[in-house]
Amino acid sequence: MLGDGNEGISTIPGFNQIQFEGFCRFIDQGLTEELYKFPKIEDTDQEIEFQLFVETYQLVEPLIKERDAVYESLTYSSELYVSAGLIWKNSRDMQEQTFFIGNIPLMNSLGTSIVNGIYRIVINQILQSPGIYYRSELDHNGISVYTGTIISDWGGRSELEIDRKARIWARVSRKQKISILVLSSAMGLNLREILENVCYPEIFLSFLSDKERKKIGSKENAILEFYQQFACVGGDPVFSESLCKELQKKFFQQRCELGRIGRRNMNRRLNLDIPQNNTFLLPRDILAAADHLIGLKFGMGALDDMNHLKNKRIRSVADLLQDQFGLALVRLENVVRGTICGAIRHKLIPTPQNLVTSTPLTTTYESFFGLHPLSQVLDRTNPLTQIVHGRKLSYLGPGGLTGRTASFRIRDIHPSHYGRICPIDTSEGINVGLIGSLAIHAKIGHWGSLESPFYEISERSTGVRMLYLSPGRDEYYMVAAGNSLALNRDIQEEQVVPARYRQEFLTIAWEQVHLRSIFPFQYFSIGASLIPFIEHNDANRALMSSNMQRQAVPLSRSEKCIVGTGLERQAALDSGALAIAEREGRVVYTNTDKILLAGNGDILSIPLVIYQRSNKNTCMHQKLQVPRGKCIKKGQILADGAATVGGELALGKNVLVAYMPWEGYNSEDAVLISERLVYEDIYTSFHIRKYEIQTHVTSQGPEKVTNEIPHLEAHLLRNLDKNGIVMLGSWVETGDILVGKLTPQVVKESSYAPEDRLLRAILGIQVSTSKETCLKLLIGGRGRVIDVRWIQKRGGSSYNPETIRVYILQKREIKVGDKVAGRHGNKGIISKILPRQDMPYLQDGRSVDMVFNPLGVPSRMNVGQIFECSLGLAGSLLDRHYRIAPFDERYEQEASRKLVFSELYEASKQTANPWVFEPEYPGKSRIFDGRTGNPFEQPVIIGKPYILKLIHQVDDKIHGRSSGHYALVTQQPLRGRAKQGGQRVGEMEVWALEGFGVAHILQEMLTYKSDHIRARQEVLGTTIIGGTIPNPEDAPESFRLLVRELRSLALELNHFLVSEKNFQINRKEA
């Protein structure tokens, strides 16, 4: 619980609550709704009827545990059983059976699903809400054209537009337009009914010509005209039943189904009272929409803001899973229908269990979790990453936008985002503004709208009442901003406060305020809420910081931050990284892998996570926090997880930093560090890599795992056990064999080596015909083997291979090339590691740990790091930790600066160190050069900020190529570290080389080292024998490719050679 002295205490909702509520809604309501839609199925003679009994469905508890599902690469799911009856109409007999129709993946306590052993999470999607929206655009003459766009529940669009002559046209899927009268008549109305149900009948009559009267003379004529325009069919189509069915299927079902949300929006926008269960577009809707369009043409009514959140809806986990379940039932219906017909045709007696198969449901969910863009692999770099991933909101995905086509207006911040979508936390790059993050107090309402909480201000009641308002409701209230929270209640009536009303910011008297914010963090996401002094930072740098905190690597020795915001504990609790006591009891036994808790007459075993690999190769490990014999309360922390300390999030380290230049080593965001950070393992982290190999059954026989591998040196096989698998605890280096494997192959007599043929002829020894296909350790993979898993699945077929996985632990100290960052977007690369005696040192003799460039602060406008830096120094000297809510200027002016200076002054007094706070230059201190012992000319800001080590590490990035593969078409080296590719020399690199006049290097880059096939073959030979490298005479392959491509366009390219002797032009073919 967090609160302010003058406000009611508000509890921050669970950060995974959005996922839990969505999945529970799917299980409670979505399953039943879709099962009720399953139709009764009859055979062609209508003698047999198949019917589901929805009330009796049941979900069975999973047969395996979560850990086993991850270990064995299985899906953590529940079996769904449904009862059905087969009714013979002639005899009125019914056969009822309960059968299994498929597996539904379940959600675990982290808000994720485990599919094939992989943690996956479903992202919430923002879509345009179904309904009608009015907007105006300027035509080529500069005249406003008003249109009304009707969006169906499936995303189909139809438009109504009014022209300069006040004629109303309907445009379906951007094709030819038809008159509104033809559309209304095709939907079943005659002319009299149309004129009776509109507000402006004279306008409708004004564009009713004789030709138009003939088109709407009867419903059949209107349908034919509409079909001709809609389907772009030439000639004169004839009215028929099949034509009506085609029109019904292509137009009315796809573009006229509004759904419950669409019907509600349509009724509100057009002031209609059509029942909610009538979810299709009616002629009454079309006529009311046309009336509103006419009103807009003559200056009555308001246009819609398409980017307002009241016109958006959230497609949550429940909606996505329900859609997939409905799709699976449609497939199941087709299977049942086909099976019934087949059984009757072959004169077999069907049973309900024989008619139904579990394949449609199981395969539908497998393909959804594996292939759908909104189903993503959970990012588990650190605990914060896990929570934030589940709270993302995406405009992308099926039915949504794309990064290439989305406009700036859609990406921009909208006033309706206040308290619902974080204005800071979004992706960088092409998806900026399209992938956002939920504000910490936001929740998804019943109708798919984002709701935000407010306190109601009432004169009658002194109590505090909290309301959750949708985006369409809060714009009718005067909402006081966050800086009015701490006003004195005795004089509130006399004060003037800033407020928000109808997307505008006003300054009004306190008595006019209806609602007020409940919390300073209300409008931020979790990532942005963890940045102290965020109000002093530029928003771009805050965005970088909220993204970079998710890239922080869990360190071997975590440390909680001195300066925080207070949300660190809540983030750690909801991340699932901690081991929490589920009940009261006493600890009777502790070990590195489990805790035994005695209580209520039995003993509960709580397993701990030990050296578990995340999908980003970071190490997830739980450390015991309770001694044996201690009594535990329910909810108490038993063990800390990765990147947590004492139940609080701990992503980095508090290190001593100076802001000053140092010999150019920290220019352009480079960072200079002390060797203390290496030798004392301050920034040491553990990483676990997984290596995997499968054994198949080939056409020549099964592959064999063995430690007897011919033609391999003994030292490469030294770590294998008798089964041919590396032993636990072994230290392995690059090139070592992890799993020995032989694959059988057919070898012809002629392909044997001479010595093998001799052995066969003289001694009769059968030479091995197997090929060595061992699992070898790749470059940069050296480390300690901590786990080996041999997963054997039932049936040793080639489709179900055995899998052997080897997990290797690496210990990585911080080194040159690693990336570090603060919490204010101040990131940098380690440029040099200095001996601690050469680092600048303070007046008390302590050497600095890091040196940052001061030029990185003023231009980036992230001054919050200076406040954090100085307050961190005071906290380390006073042994205090600070938890500061953002926007503390609401208490008084310059509140942040006063707090920092007062703490520095107190630290100076208590520690008797006057250099900590010097009035001439507060916050700065004179420090000394470690190499000479002389003081620097200017005082320098020193402090203890919280610095993170990011996952962008030099061990994963650095790469060199001596030889490798070439692309077949261009004959140039492949691209990328994974393919052992080469460096690409682009235009700008060539310019740089040209600037220095290095002609030979340029020639090598364009020929030998790139795509000149003959020249690079000759280089090897001349290098070996020591001759001079010949100059290439013909063109490289890329030039030859260009010539061929031009020839494919019927362009012949020739070139001319100018003789040096007589300058005669000799023409040669390319």
Swiss-Prot record:
Its EC number is 2.7.7.6. Its main location: plastid. InterPro entries: DNA-dir_RNA_pol_bsu_ext_1_sf, DNA-dir_RNA_pol_su2, DNA-dir_RNAP_su2_dom, DNA-dir_RNAP_su2_hyb_sf, RNA_pol_bsu_bac, RNA_pol_bsu_CS, RNA_pol_Rpb2_2, RNA_pol_Rpb2_2_sf. It catalyses: RNA(n) + a ribonucleoside 5'-triphosphate = RNA(n+1) + diphosphate. One of its GO terms (cellular component) is DNA-directed RNA polymerase complex. Gene3D superfamilies: 2.40.50.100, 2.40.50.150, 3.90.1100.10, DNA-directed RNA polymerase, beta subunit, external 1 domain, DNA-directed RNA polymerase, subunit 2, domain 6, RNA polymerase alpha subunit dimerisation domain, RNA polymerase Rpb2, domain 2. Pfam families: RNA_pol_Rpb2_2, RNA_pol_Rpb2_3, RNA_pol_Rpb2_6, RNA_pol_Rpb2_7. It comes from the Eukaryota. Keywords: Chloroplast, DNA-directed RNA polymerase, Nucleotidyltransferase, Plastid, Transcription, Transferase. NCBIfam families: PRK00405.1. In plastids the minimal PEP RNA polymerase catalytic core is composed of four subunits: alpha, beta, beta', and beta''. When a (nuclear-encoded) sigma factor is associated with the core the holoenzyme is formed, which can initiate transcription. DNA-dependent RNA polymerase catalyzes the transcription of DNA into RNA using the four ribonucleoside triphosphates as substrates. Belongs to the RNA polymerase beta chain family. This is DNA-directed RNA polymerase subunit beta.
